[in-house]
């Protein structure tokens, strides 16, 4: 919808605020000049499209707020850390229900979208429009509502399941449904939505939900809950659409020039200078180049990238500790700023803690020496405070790797043809061209697939955050010691900055200098304390 959404987002945003803030006021009985009541609104297809845009805008796939959550929860893993607020507490075992910075915004945004979707579905039949068009927009709204429940259930577990517009009294007495009930609802809704969604759209409708997106979210949810055979079948449905494909590019996928790629199945809808993105070209920018560098990539992620002979750094004869970034998987260079190696805008990236800060974020100097490069555009000249860069949520590479993992875990036969259709298709893109995988031993292949997901999707939609939880390795990886770039070969006598016994930088964040233990219960977020105060029927997650 990005091409058409620019024309209607502002109107829709204002309109939907006035229409849908009614959960706190008797707005149906009033019609001030700045608002519209239901009796004067649901009269035409144009009204429908405005309401639809308002739901897109409210949801997690439609805003810069989601980009912030990608930043935060991608940085709530063993890949990187986020410098600010409550997310850094996740590493230290002190994440609390009152840490509202991201816990509350996820909950509120999701239920705002769900309310808008319910309101839409209760009123759409009033509109006289083509039956096929009506079925399509209903499918879009059912998808958008189901996506919010998918996201809520992934972050919190069971949550209140609301499928109609509620009064304030009803809303404040809702109890949590079981996780299984939420998952069943989501799968049913996504299945129904996929039937009425088109496989493709004209360029003028780019950004509106497609059949592949509904199937991809469904497959991902099935995989999270280890329903492997169903997940494999659903992923195969997407493959058989013959709509999406692996882009030969990699770096450009995460820039504005890549937004039309056939690899992208679902992404945010960001519009420069209207509903812009402050993260890609400012907050993720290293301070060395004038940004805030709000993320700190850990050494463990850097080490996960293989050598370009396809072997880990511990096994490859190409690895040279004195030149650790030479001869690596090309995705490393596209994803991470590497100290004294990456050249960006004609300047060599330097990150030693002794350097005088050259950026605008003096208190925010990086704590590991490594910076987030994915999504940062070298030749960007626009407004860094409101760029138009979308953020990818699901792309076709995840479909292929998800299909392989689902086939592997369901016990199906693993053949070279299957590997070539999936993981080798991903690794073989022109810009990457890593050696093909030939391993068919299940245990060994499982580790290869997991590492491939880590490097292919690093620093994207919180894929790693979800993966380490569904693989049941969350506490294992989160309780390790994190560190950054190597500062010295003589750590036993080095006193300038805190280092590990290997001479690697420890920085200053809680994520690096642990003060607590991450517990298994921390795999789920706490229900926002503010919501429990309003609705005592809500039970808090264990451990909080």
Name the predicted role of every residue range.
Residues 1-21:
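Sec-dependent bacterial lipoprotein signal peptides
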Residues 91, 319-396, 543:
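Flexible, polar/acidic helix-loop-strand segments at domain edges
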Residues 24-87, 183, 191-194, 208-357, ...:
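An aromatic- and glycine-enriched ligand-binding surface/loop that stacks and positions planar moieties
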Residues 44-63, 86-156, 171-184, 190-203, ...:
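Conserved, well-structured interaction surfaces
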Residues 23-24, 110-113, 185-187, 254-311, ...:
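Long, intrinsically disordered, low-complexity segments
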């Amino acid at each position: 919808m990005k091409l058409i959404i620019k024309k209607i987002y502002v109107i829709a945003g204002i309109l939907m605020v006035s229409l849908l803030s009614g959960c706190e006021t008797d707005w149906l009985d009033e019609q001030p000049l700045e608002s519209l009541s239901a009796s004067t609104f649901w009269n035409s297809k144009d009204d429908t499209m405005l309401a639809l845009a308002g739901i897109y805008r409210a949801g997690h796939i439609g805003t810069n707020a989601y980009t912030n959550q990608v930043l935060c929860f991608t940085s709530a893993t063993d890949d990187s850390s986020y410098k600010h607020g409550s997310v850094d507490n996740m590493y230290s075992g002190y994440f609390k229900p009152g840490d509202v910075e991201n816990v509350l915004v996820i909950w509120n945004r999701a239920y705002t979208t769900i309310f808008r979707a319910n309101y839409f579905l209760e009123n759409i039949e009033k509109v006289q429009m083509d039956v096929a068009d009506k079925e399509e927009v209903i499918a879009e709204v059912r998808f958008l509502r189901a996506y919010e429940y998918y996201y809520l259930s992934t972050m919190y577990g069971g949550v209140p399941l609301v499928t109609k517009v509620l009064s304030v009294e009803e809303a404040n007495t809702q109890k949590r449904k079981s996780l299984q009930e939420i998952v069943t609802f989501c799968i049913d809704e996504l299945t129904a939505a996929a039937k009425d969604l088109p496989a493709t759209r004209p360029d003028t409708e780019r950004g509106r939900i497609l059949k592949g997106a509904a199937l991809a979210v469904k497959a991902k949810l099935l995989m999270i809950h280890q329903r492997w055979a169903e997940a494999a079948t659903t992923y195969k449905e997407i493959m058989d659409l013959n709509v999406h494909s692996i882009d030969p590019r990699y770096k450009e996928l995460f820039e504005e020039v890549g937004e039309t790629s056939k690899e992208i199945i679902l992404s945010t809808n960001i519009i420069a200078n209207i509903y812009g993105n402050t993260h890609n070209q400012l907050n993720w920018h290293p301070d060395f180049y004038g940004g805030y560098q709000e993320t700190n990539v850990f050494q463990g992620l850097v080490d996960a990238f293989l050598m370009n002979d396809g072997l880990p750094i511990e096994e490859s004869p190409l690895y040279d500790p004195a030149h650790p970034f030479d001869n690596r998987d090309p995705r490393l260079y596209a994803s991470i700023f590497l100290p004294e190696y990456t050249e960006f805008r004609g300047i060599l990236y330097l990150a030693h803690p002794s350097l005088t800060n050259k950026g605008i974020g003096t208190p925010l100097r990086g704590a590991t020496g490594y910076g987030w490069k994915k999504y940062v555009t070298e030749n960007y000249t626009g407004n860094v405070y409101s760029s138009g860069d979308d953020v990818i949520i699901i792309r076709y590479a995840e479909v292929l790797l998800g299909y392989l993992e689902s086939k592997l875990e369901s016990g199906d036969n693993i053949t070279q043809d299957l590997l070539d259709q999936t993981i080798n298709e991903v690794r073989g893109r022109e810009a990457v061209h890593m050696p093909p995988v030939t391993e068919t031993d299940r245990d060994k292949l499982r580790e290869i697939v997991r590492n491939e997901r880590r490097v292919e999707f690093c620093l994207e939609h919180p894929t790693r955050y979800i993966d380490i939880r569904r693989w049941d390795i969350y506490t294992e990886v989160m309780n390790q010691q994190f560190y950054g770039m190597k500062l010295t070969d003589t750590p036993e006598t080095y006193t300038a900055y805190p280092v590990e016994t290997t001479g690697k930088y420890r920085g200053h964040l809680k994520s690096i200098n642990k003060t607590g233990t991450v517990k298994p219960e921390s795999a789920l977020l706490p229900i926002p304390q503010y919501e429990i105060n309003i609705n005592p029927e809500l039970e808090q997650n264990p451990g909080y």
